[in-house]
């Protein structure tokens, strides 16, 4: 099997960054785990993820430039067309970061960046419990809260890219602050 058919999927969470080497059949065959704190700044993230992707590619006798591509799911606002992360609620220092460009330069292969909950919804729709469904709502609950929405077999991002994202409100004005600042 040629390396150009393998991809790497990355889940950038508020606690951990998980990178998985994905076979052409959609199976995760190898993973690497990084602490989000260790790669909290964009330059550290690109370098740390670069090393993880190199290691994953080597595990199938390849190099990153020979992979089909790398896709990062980020827990925040993402301009999918330009590959720019506008902000991450639980990870400071991420404002208007051209992550796709930085990763493509580092890895030498095609890269994509999207909201993590949108990618979760697409994954379930394509390979998981949502396979065959025309409408699907996926909610992520971890360090943060997110949502992805598929209607009529199409991922919906909405005008501002936040379709499917659940809102939240202050319950106790004197309570602890949320990662969003409220």
Q: Residue spans of the language-model regions?
A:
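Glycine/GP-enriched mid-protein hinge/lid loop-to-helix segment characteristic of carbohydrate kinases
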Residues: 2-6, 20-23, 30-33, 40-45, ...
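Assembly/interface hotspot detector across virion components, adhesins/toxins, and nucleic-acid enzymes
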Residues: 8, 76-78, 150
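Conserved catalytic-loop position in the HRD/HxD motif
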Residues: 11
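Conserved Rossmann-like nucleotide-cofactor binding loop
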Residues: 15
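Glycine/Thr-rich phosphate-binding loops of Rossmann-like dinucleotide-binding domains
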Residues: 18, 80-82, 147
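Short coil turn/linker residues within repeat-based beta-strand modules
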Residues: 26-28, 82
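Glycine-rich phosphate-binding loop and adjoining helix at the ATP-binding site
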Residues: 36-38, 42-50, 54, 58, ...
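A short alpha-helix-loop-beta-strand transition element characteristic
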Residues: 64-65, 158
């Amino acid at each position: 099997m040629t390396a150009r058919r393998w991809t790497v999927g990355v889940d950038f969470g508020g606690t951990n960054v998980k990178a998985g080497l994905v076979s052409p059949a959609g199976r995760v065959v190898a993973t690497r785990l990084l602490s989000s704190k260790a790669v909290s700044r964009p330059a550290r993230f690109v370098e740390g993820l670069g090393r993880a992707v190199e290691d994953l590619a080597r595990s199938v006798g390849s190099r990153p430039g020979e992979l089909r591509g790398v896709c990062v799911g980020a827990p925040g606002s993402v301009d999918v067309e330009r590959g720019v992360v506008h902000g991450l609620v639980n990870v400071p220092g991420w404002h208007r970061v051209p992550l796709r460009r930085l990763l493509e330069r580092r890895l030498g292969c095609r890269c994509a960046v999207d909201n993590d909950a949108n990618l979760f919804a697409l994954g379930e729709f394509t390979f998981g419990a949502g396979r065959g469904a025309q409408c699907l709502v996926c909610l992520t609950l971890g360090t943060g809260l997110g949502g992805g929405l598929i209607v009529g077999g199409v991922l919906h991002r909405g005008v501002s890219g936040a379709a499917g994202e659940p809102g939240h409100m202050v319950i106790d004005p004197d309570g602890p602050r949320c990662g969003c600042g409220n």
